[in-house]
Amino acid sequence: MTPSIQIIFASQTGRNRAIAGHLQAQLASRAQTVITEISQVDAFALTQADAVIIVSYTYHDGDLPDEAQDFFEDLKEVDLKRTKFAVCGSSSKRHIHFGRAIDYLTIQFNSSNGEQVADSVKIDQDPDDADYQRLNQLAQNVLASLA
């Protein structure tokens, strides 16, 4: 049976939407994927997917994006029942707290009984070749966890 992977993104500039698209392309041959903007996601339904990948930016100096706030608050009340997950996204090293939203989301997914299957990936603004390699590895780790 083909595994299902939900890719959830928050994007202000389009970077993270593009990252979500890149991940979908990496996963498409071996999994059913759905890309959804984070404000449209029901955190209580995450366990319906075999795995979840969150792609988020960090707003200002370490904040979650506004559009991710409701999702994040709901996530605090969800039992993910060992749903596999990975977190990645873009930020700016000019911020005091580079990629802190990635950290917040990773911590909350773990606290909600998720199973982290790949190291979180933080990207400084637009991805370069090394970043794409790390994203490809994240995708491969998610797929391997479902085998």
What are the functions of these language-model segments?
Residues 2-5, 15-18, 26, 30, ...:
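FMN-binding flavodoxin-like domain, especially the glycine-rich phosphate-binding loop
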Residues 10-14:
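Short polar catalytic/cofactor-binding loops
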Residues 40-45:
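Short acidic active-site motifs
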